């Protein structure tokens, strides 16, 4: 039986990825990132203050918030603000985004400033957290480039690029960049965050159906590295445009 994906993509093929800069007017950095039908608005906001634990230390901070619009999925979900608290999934994802982006920033060069990345899912079709990280990096880069242009900082605080992609085992085959039909029916699901130097920042992998073997893990990481190379090229092209 010939293996096929619901989308018709090959096992090592990303969905069509678009990175649109300056999508909104007011934020220092603003990006609409699309991975196929998944669309996330990422904005970077700069404030001249830091959390209490960093006051007087001369260091900056990078953090993130994440949320999904009520009808970003097949059925409407209540806004978390209406429920009075954020869910565990939301907190997990926004902490992941913050950790990923702090890994590419020299916080001493940033000075006592906070950059907040707000990642709002407009439409979800799998891979929202990886799309958010990939787009938020470009929004962050735009924000720090503006700080340099205005003379607010002298040294560029970015020490490399960061992107993320999902991989998984779907119907027994390792695949790259899972969409919703694959994500909801896969044997293994993994999110990979890397820098453009080839270093791994975070791996989140879970066996959904059956335990995965070491050779399958190696195959998944190889797929992630291939996809990451394409994503870094897209980020560079977007920032050069």
UniProtKB/Swiss-Prot annotation:
It comes from Xanthomonas axonopodis pv. citri (strain 306). Homohexameric ring arranged as a trimer of dimers. NCBIfam families: RNasePH (TIGR01966). Belongs to the RNase PH family. This is Ribonuclease PH. Phosphate binds at residues 89, 127-129. The keyword Nucleotidyltransferase applies. The keyword RNA-binding applies. PANTHER family: EXOSOME COMPLEX COMPONENT, EXOSOME COMPLEX COMPONENT RRP41. CDD domains: RNase_PH_bact. GO terms for molecular function: 3'-5'-RNA exonuclease activity; tRNA binding; tRNA nucleotidyltransferase activity. GO terms for biological process: rRNA catabolic process; rRNA processing; tRNA processing.
């Amino acid at each position: 039986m010939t293996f096929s994906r619901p989308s018709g993509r090959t096992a090592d093929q990303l969905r069509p990825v678009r990175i649109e800069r300056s999508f909104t007017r007011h934020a220092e950095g603003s990006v609409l990132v699309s991975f196929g039908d998944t669309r996330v608005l990422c904005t970077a906001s700069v404030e001249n203050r830091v959390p209490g634990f960093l006051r007087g230390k001369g260091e900056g901070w990078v953090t993130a918030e994440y949320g999904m619009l009520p009808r970003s999925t097949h059925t409407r979900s209540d806004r978390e603000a209406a429920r009075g608290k954020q869910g565990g999934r939301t907190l997990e994802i926004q902490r992941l985004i913050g950790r990923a982006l702090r890994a590419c920033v020299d916080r001493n060069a940033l000075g006592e400033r906070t950059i907040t990345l707000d990642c709002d899912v407009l439409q979800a079709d799998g891979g929202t957290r990886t799309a958010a990280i990939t787009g938020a990096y470009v929004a962050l880069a735009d924000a720090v480039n503006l700080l340099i242009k205005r003379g607010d900082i002298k040294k560029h605080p970015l020490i490399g690029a960061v992107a993320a992609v999902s991989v998984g085992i779907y119907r027994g085959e390792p695949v790259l960049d899972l969409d919703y039909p694959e994500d909801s029916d896969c044997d293994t699901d993994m999110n990979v965050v890397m820098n453009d130097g080839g270093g791994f920042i975070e791996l989140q992998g879970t066996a959904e159906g059956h335990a995965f073997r070491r050779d399958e893990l190696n195959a998944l990481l190889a797929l992630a590295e291939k996809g990451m190379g394409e994503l870094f090229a897209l980020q560079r092209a977007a920032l050069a445009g």
